[in-house]
Amino acid sequence: MTEQNQQPKTYCGFIAIVGRPNVGKSTLLNKILGQKISITSRKAQTTRHRIVGIHTEDQYQAIYVDTPGLHIEEKRAINRLMNRAASSAIGDVDLIIFVVEGTKWTDDDEMVLNKLRAAKAPVVLAINKVDNIKEKDELLPHITELSQKFDFAEILPISAQRGKNVHILQKIVRKSLREGVHHFPEEYVTDRSQRFMASEIIREKLMRFTGEELPYSVTVEIEQFKLNERGTYEINGLILVEREGQKKMVIGVKGQKIKTIGMEARADMERLFDNKVHLELWVKVKAGWADDERALRSLGYMDE
């Protein structure tokens, strides 16, 4: 076989993104992929499912596992499940990206690091939000201190929001990939269904427009997702909360808040699906759903 007829070698691998809640893991994944796949908000615990983001460039395919934030507190069933998903993501991957926030180091960071000690894959420490560090001369001593805690393969200061050094991180990822066939077609950026992405978009808007009013005992169930004869997606979303007071928060005065949530969610869906969307939302009280493992299984939290 001549050189001209030979197919170029291809490389593929799995990358786990881990870290305590709210350090910017989802923002980093979205920046790498070039579009929003993982739900982002300023609240912790916004990522609940192991969303797989797929980035293919030339002969390289990196499959990213965006984990829920690891938690010390496991009093509720949903937190136990999120911890379990994050811990399982650490095993059987080619590279682990451990994301921390600036010069902060918390007990939660220490707990995540302790879980990584048993990992077989190399660990890259990504120090995120470095653009927010006011005293820049504190960064280098902080890096030195962290380097003594663990044998990191690399320590890289980044800003996921602004894209600073993300291209360097991607080069590190490429080097970790193994020679082998790609698992997904080149155009794929996620293995999640449109139905799942619709529920994530609605949940993101809930987080954004309820501010600190609404705790994490809220989820979204897509009851209908179909393409009608006019070529429009008809989507019905059921928002589950635990208390009547939370229902009132979501609906808002004269229904204004849920109207805003619906309008913003529909606009995002139309951009993502490249199609017209008719979205209807309802709010229902389902007491104790976040503590009920059967309810969590039916809502898709135990499909990992």
From Swiss-Prot:
Residues 19-26 are annotated as: G1. Coiled coil: none annotated. Residues 11-179 form the Era-type G domain. Residues 128-131 are annotated as: G4. Residues 210-287 form the KH type-2 domain. GO terms for molecular function: GTP binding; GTPase activity; ribosomal small subunit binding; small ribosomal subunit rRNA binding. PROSITE patterns: G_ERA, KH_TYPE_2. SUPFAM superfamilies: P-loop containing nucleoside triphosphate hydrolases, Prokaryotic type KH domain (KH-domain type II). This is GTPase Era.
